[in-house]
Amino acid sequence: MSTPASAAPAALVRVPAGTTAGTAVREAGYPSKGPDVVVVVRDAEGGLRDLSWVPDADVDVEPVAANTDDGRSVIRHSAAHVLAQAVQQEFPEAKLGIGPPIKDGFYYDFAVERPFTPEDLANLEKRMKKIVKGSQRFSRRVVDSLEEARAELANEPFKLELIDDKSGIDDPEIMEVGGNELTIYDNLDPRTGEKVWGDLCRGPHIPTTKHIPAFKLTRSSAAYWRGNQDNADLQRIYGTAWESAEAQEQHLELLAEAERRDHRKLGSELDLFSFPDELGSGLPVFHPRGGIIRTEMEDYSRKRHVEEGYEFVNTPHITKGHLYEVSGHLDWYRDGMFPAMHIDEELNEDGTVRKPGQDYYLKPMNCPMHNLIFRSRGRSYRELPLRLFEFGSVYRYEKSGVVHGLTRVRGMTQDDAHIYCTREQMRDELATTLQFVLGLLKDYGLDDFYLELSTKNPDKFVGDDAVWEEATATLAEVAESSGLNLVPDPGGAAFYGPKISVQVQDALGRTWQMSTIQLDFNLPERFDLEYTASDGTKKRPVMIHRALFGSIERFFGVLTEHYAGAFPAWLAPVQVVGIPVAETFADHLFDVVKRLKAAGVRAEVDASDDRMQKKIFNNTAQKVPFMLLAGARDVEAGAVSFRFRDGTQVNGVPVDDAVRIVTDWIGRRENASPTAELLQSGREG
């Protein structure tokens, strides 16, 4: 299941001076309806233009079809306008915020007297359908002056702010202003040409509302004006729009499946973790079953790190603030840290300070403490590369509005490593680290990757440009040599160095950022890290930051959704459950379970009072990979019958074979769910 693919770029079309782009496209024979209908064109500079655009001179343009990424984006932006028109018809007092297209959809923010209800969304959809059916024309109009724009939009305070801030806005989600002129898009009645509604917007838009063949409003939520919690409270409506009903249905099926796989829902249903209100937002607790999965994840990671030459360290959860002054975190990352704890102050009886206190912080990152371990004694080139590894707990102040289940938390455990090496070792160490990261992710069943290269943010970095350029070039070379697709992320690096991030696609085709590998020449300088080179001189090591899972919590959430809660048998909290056909046969299964437990398998017998079919139903719902059934024939033959998650079954398997099948499957760390077909093929093989 995946999002509909985009069409290939179209051949160029010549638009004569004085002719609309739409006329030239039609005369060139492009479709006038359907999912590949042309909705806008791309000019020679790469900008998107309305089909009503009339160039001053002959120009070649690229037709942009509805079933392309750009085409869908334009459809969604136009759908946002239709939504805003419907809202102001239904709620005349509503004030307009912004309404951009986003991935797979759009939203629009409104200042209204109360939150929107599901009934409101249903009514708004009906209004939108009438507007779409009315085939209103989108007409671009240049406003001659700021004064004229302010007068026309005098009742829209948020639009007035955008007009006043026009020159200082650099936000891709603000579609209202941009370029060298202010424009308003009017929706015109197709019969009379009269203006029905309008909005401040830089465009472009589809020719008419009829070019929105499929849309749906999905939800509403609270929002802040321009994303700042200090600004006005708004209400946001989200929707989706597509080039065809079929494409939208495919997307909605994907959303429904994603909802079924939501790790927050599965975490509760499978008794894996919870978020007690008493602890606070973004602070999960893992229950025994979730603890088993987490322990298995961590133990396998530890084993692989030992094999790769990593050494384990451990650091405290809090530190004096001075450490993060040295590292630069307090200068560049303070907003992401919890407030200081001022402690150790001692007072005299009269209240005067006898001993001043100090600021302590919960650590947001482990790297400064690992630097102290490196610096704790003299280091020789013979020790390098030195690979320090820790499951380190860190704490980051995420705003409550962005905290989301396990994938965005405030307290997390990182599988954090810092590698110290020479300049000569740097490239090979990066390449080895990347291959280790990719291999370990594959071991957990994630094998669809691409890489992202995050480069310097010119407004937020430490060090000099030459060092950054060298680090970036080295990372780019290593990433390109991996053979994976490399996508640029300009300005996305942390303040201390560029990074490669591994982007992983899950079973639904969604992309998650997982591992990061960051090259850093700056922190070794700030911490005065040195090693003795082979010629006896002191040199700075290169530092490589590397988190493979990103965080245990995030990785746990991603795996839960990737497997829809049906974890591979080697990770499953309960790997085998025995289900007797009747209580008479339970002892037979207890003997089998005893053998499995002795072999290290997490096995148990369902001794509840439920009937056999209910037990099968319950344990299937709990995603148990192996269910062993036993009736009279099984007991008589010294056998069991296998039942699997998918409902398939293999009867009469001798107990010795059954124990071997289960232990071999788990021992191989198979990530596929066992089935009758896989078991039979394995036995035959």
Curated annotation (Swiss-Prot):
Keywords: Aminoacyl-tRNA synthetase, ATP-binding, Cytoplasm, Ligase, Metal-binding, Nucleotide-binding, Protein biosynthesis, RNA-binding, tRNA-binding, Zinc. SUPFAM superfamilies: Class II aaRS ABD-related, Class II aaRS and biotin synthetases, ThrRS/AlaRS common domain. Its cofactor is Zn(2+). The keyword Ligase applies. SMART domains: tRNA_SAD. One of its GO terms (molecular function) is metal ion binding. It is found in: Cytoplasm. It catalyses: tRNA(Thr) + L-threonine + ATP = L-threonyl-tRNA(Thr) + AMP + diphosphate + H(+). Its main location: cytoplasm. One of its GO terms (biological process) is threonyl-tRNA aminoacylation. Binds 1 zinc ion per subunit. Its EC number is 6.1.1.3. PROSITE patterns: AA_TRNA_LIGASE_II, TGS. Residues 262-568 are annotated as: Catalytic. The keyword Nucleotide-binding applies. Belongs to the class-II aminoacyl-tRNA synthetase family. Catalyzes the attachment of threonine to tRNA(Thr) in a two-step reaction: L-threonine is first activated by ATP to form Thr-AMP and then transferred to the acceptor end of tRNA(Thr). Also edits incorrectly charged L-seryl-tRNA(Thr). This is Threonine--tRNA ligase. The lineage of its organism: Bacteria, Bacillati, Actinomycetota, Actinomycetes, Mycobacteriales.
